[in-house]
Amino acid sequence: MKKLIVSFAIITTLIIGCKTNTKSNDAKTLTVALEPKSNSKVGGTATFTEKNGKVTFTAKMTGLEPGVHAIHIHEKADCSAADGSSAGGHWNPTFKKHGKWGVGEYHKGDIGNFTADAKGNGSITLTTDEWCIGCDDETKNILNKGLIVHQGTDDFTTQPTGNAGGRAACAGIIK
């Protein structure tokens, strides 16, 4: 009888453990490394996590000039050019004007600005239901796009780029 109870307890624990583990794997997570461009020393990582129909984006950068910088998703996951130009323009699958995220018209790649501290470290986080990781909706799918950290600030007005300056770092958003 003890063997039966012990066996039942072990099987129950395994079933509950597997079920819990499956639920924690519902999130899709992708982390990419930012590489320096345009003779900068900028590096860092960006993580995209999709859960419950929303993507949370977090980027952490180092080597920046202190001050405000723009960050955008660009058309291509190609960082081969020394100045990052191979990533193309801002990702704009809905053909909107450049602007500020969540205000009027804006590109799906118009993430916005963040501030680098006196040591050159900066971070930004955004959560949205306007992106997905690897879905069939090409107006939302961020895979195979580029992530660009700019040397300057996005003014949210100048078309089509926000006058954000050169490209300080690039990452391909690829699996």
Predicted regions: what they are:
Residues 19-68, 73-175:
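N-terminal leader/targeting pre-sequences
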Residues 1-4, 19:
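Positively charged n-region of N-terminal signal peptides that target proteins for export
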Residues 14-17:
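C-terminal motif of bacterial Sec signal peptides marking the signal peptidase cleavage site
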